[in-house]
């Protein structure tokens, strides 16, 4: 729901705004950083996370950790998609386009709310993934007790609903007034905070005191529970995870005396160890790229100053962290690389077999046309032969009857002399 209101005016539509007034960038530095670097990282991050999903959602790899990592990939994809309109606003092609200015002007704060929601979801998912790995490594027996309730579905649902509630204030935090200038060729939007003392046309603020207080308090609550607390917890648990990995590395030295169940147990522990290494790499990258943005967001809620350039740099770091997940999977997991190569080869083989089958089916259809014509000709010749043969049979039956009658008479006439001959020449 957009909070846009139209300011009626009689003469303002004839006034044309300058390029600076029509610019959607706060500064030229922000335009260069957000408009140039972000699109490349967004495209790379979306394609990389899609490849991550193809491997993590394979039927034989749907473990608890992989399901949580797949949910993290989905949250990162959503974040990258909703960040893209902010980057497009810094291009002159979209900045001067009437349709884009209307869309971006009406739904800018809804896009910001979606961005904050998806980033908050990804932040808490990283915390849950790190905590889950730490519990599996340090307390493997307690996982079965907690597996019934703390399933990936329940955990992700709780995170998504909670972060939506904490970031939903962005949908109602501002009210915007839209107007067409320069005889309807320029679209401009001006926005004010709900808690602003000055309103449009210097009128009194029509919003209630409850809404004003909610909009004032909500950013601070969001900064604490969505930004500061999860990032600090991720840093603490990531350090604990790294220390635990260093302690357990000595346990996986090659041994020749391992047999039976102990060998299977060590093999399973090695697998968990490799998964933990991948998770540690992802969480460490998240900590490095997300922490500056978290602290800048937290400080901007209390210290009012110009954070434009620093916020743009932090945004690039956040997008870079989401784009590097695919690289981290490939570098830290040999099984991920093997699965990805195998699925790529299978996809290429499927496409090649489909094209070959389509080509062969088309050639069979083309080759079958003259064969069908030949078969029809042969069938016509067979029918003609059968009709001629049937006519010959009808005429032949009559001739056979007359021939049999004549032959029977001739045989009777011939037998009589034979009998007489036999009687006359008998030796009795």
UniProtKB/Swiss-Prot annotation:
A cellular component term, taken from the record's GO annotations: plasma membrane
Record's subcellular location: Cell membrane
Alphabetical UniProt keywords: Cell membrane, G-protein coupled receptor, Glycoprotein, Membrane, Receptor, Transducer, Transmembrane, Transmembrane helix
A Pfam family recorded for this sequence: 7TM_GPCR_Srw
Stored InterPro entries: 7TM_GPCR_serpentine_rcpt_Srw, GPCR_Rhodpsn, GPCR_Rhodpsn_7TM
Bilayer-spanning residue ranges: 31-51, 68-88, 111-131, 155-175, 223-243, 279-299, 310-330
Ranges facing Cytoplasmic side: 52-67, 132-154, 244-278, 331-428
Keyword Glycoprotein: yes
Family statement: Belongs to the G-protein coupled receptor 1 family.
Extracellular topological segments: 1-30, 89-110, 176-222, 300-309
Gene Ontology MF annotations: G protein-coupled peptide receptor activity
Residues carrying sugar: 3-4, 183
Protein name: Putative G-protein coupled receptor F59B2.13
Top-rank taxon, per record: Eukaryota
Topology in the lipid bilayer: Multi-pass membrane protein
């Amino acid at each position: 729901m957009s909070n846009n209101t139209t300011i009626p005016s009689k003469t303002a539509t004839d006034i044309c705004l300058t390029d600076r007034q029509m610019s959607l960038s706060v500064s030229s530095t922000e335009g260069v950083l957000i408009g140039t670097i972000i699109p490349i990282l967004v495209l790379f991050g979306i394609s990389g996370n899609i490849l991550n999903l193809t491997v993590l959602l394979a039927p034989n790899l749907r473990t608890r950790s992989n399901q949580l990592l797949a949910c993290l990939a989905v949250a990162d994809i959503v974040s990258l998609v909703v960040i893209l309109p902010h980057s497009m606003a810094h291009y002159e092609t979209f900045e001067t386009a009437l349709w884009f200015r209307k869309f971006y002007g009406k739904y800018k704060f809804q896009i910001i709310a979606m961005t904050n929601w998806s980033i908050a979801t990804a932040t808490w998912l990283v915390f849950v993934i790190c905590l889950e790995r730490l519990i599996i490594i340090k307390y493997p027996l307690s996982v079965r007790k907690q597996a019934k309730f703390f399933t990936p579905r329940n955990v992700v649902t709780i995170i998504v609903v909670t972060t939506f509630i904490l970031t939903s204030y962005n949908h109602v935090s501002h009210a915007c007034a839209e107007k067409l200038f320069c005889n309807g060729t320029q679209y401009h939007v001006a926005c004010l905070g709900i808690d602003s003392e000055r309103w449009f046309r210097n009128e009194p603020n029509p919003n209630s005191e409850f809404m004003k207080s909610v909009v004032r308090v909500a950013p601070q609550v969001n900064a604490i529970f969505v930004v500061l607390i999860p990032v600090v917890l991720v840093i603490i648990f990531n350090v604990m995870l790294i220390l635990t990995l260093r302690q357990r590395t000595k346990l996986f030295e090659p041994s020749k005396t391992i047999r039976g169940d102990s060998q299977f147990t060590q093999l399973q522990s090695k697998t968990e160890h490799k998964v933990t290494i991948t998770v540690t790499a992802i969480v460490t990258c998240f900590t490095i790229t997300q922490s500056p943005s978290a602290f800048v967001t937290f400080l901007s809620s209390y210290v009012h100053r110009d954070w434009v350039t620093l916020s743009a740099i932090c945004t690039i770091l956040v997008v870079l962290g989401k784009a590097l997940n695919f690289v981290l999977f490939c570098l830290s997991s040999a099984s991920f690389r093997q699965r990805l190569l195998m699925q790529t080869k299978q996809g290429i083989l499927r496409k090649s077999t489909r094209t070959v089958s389509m080509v062969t089916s088309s050639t069979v259809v083309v080759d079958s046309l003259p064969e069908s014509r030949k078969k029809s000709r042969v069938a016509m010749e067979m029918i003609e032969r059968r009709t001629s043969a049937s006519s010959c049979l009808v005429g032949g039956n009559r001739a056979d009857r007359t021939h049999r009658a004549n032959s029977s008479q001739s045989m009777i006439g011939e037998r009589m002399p034979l009998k007489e001959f036999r009687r006359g020449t008998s030796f009795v």
